[in-house]
Amino acid sequence: MGESFDAFSLDEDMPMETNEKRKDGRDRGTRAQSAVVVQPVAASRHK
């Protein structure tokens, strides 16, 4: 039972849906960071 429980918990820990959501989250986080970086640069250019 220990082995099948390990395999089951692994499936629950890293399902394909979670992996896709994690990738989306990383992409959104990167976009948010670049947007935050671009805004101050654009503001200083306007000044």
Curated annotation (Swiss-Prot):
<keyword id="KW-0920">Virion tegument</keyword>
<keyword id="KW-0519">Myristate</keyword>
<dbReference type="GO" id="GO:0016020">
    <property type="term" value="C:membrane"/>
</dbReference>
<feature type="compositionally biased region" description="Low complexity">
    <location>
        <begin position="32"/>
        <end position="47"/>
    </location>
</feature>
<protein>
    <recommendedName>
        <fullName>Tegument protein UL11</fullName>
    </recommendedName>
</protein>
<keyword id="KW-0449">Lipoprotein</keyword>
<feature type="compositionally biased region" description="Basic and acidic residues">
    <location>
        <begin position="18"/>
        <end position="30"/>
    </location>
</feature>
<keyword id="KW-1040">Host Golgi apparatus</keyword>
<dbReference type="GO" id="GO:0020002">
    <property type="term" value="C:host cell plasma membrane"/>
</dbReference>
<keyword id="KW-0946">Virion</keyword>
<keyword id="KW-0472">Membrane</keyword>
<feature type="lipid moiety-binding region" description="N-myristoyl glycine; by host">
    <location>
        <position position="2"/>
    </location>
</feature>
<comment type="similarity">
    <text>Belongs to the herpesviridae HHV-1 UL11 family.</text>
</comment>
<dbReference type="GO" id="GO:0044178">
    <property type="term" value="C:host cell Golgi membrane"/>
</dbReference>
<keyword id="KW-1032">Host cell membrane</keyword>
<comment type="function">
    <text>Plays an important role in the cytoplasmic envelopment of tegument proteins and capsids during the assembly and egress processes. Also participates in viral entry at the fusion step probably by regulating the core fusion machinery.</text>
</comment>
<feature type="region of interest" description="Disordered">
    <location>
        <begin position="1"/>
        <end position="47"/>
    </location>
</feature>
<dbReference type="GO" id="GO:0055036">
    <property type="term" value="C:virion membrane"/>
</dbReference>
<dbReference type="GO" id="GO:0019033">
    <property type="term" value="C:viral tegument"/>
</dbReference>
<keyword id="KW-1043">Host membrane</keyword>
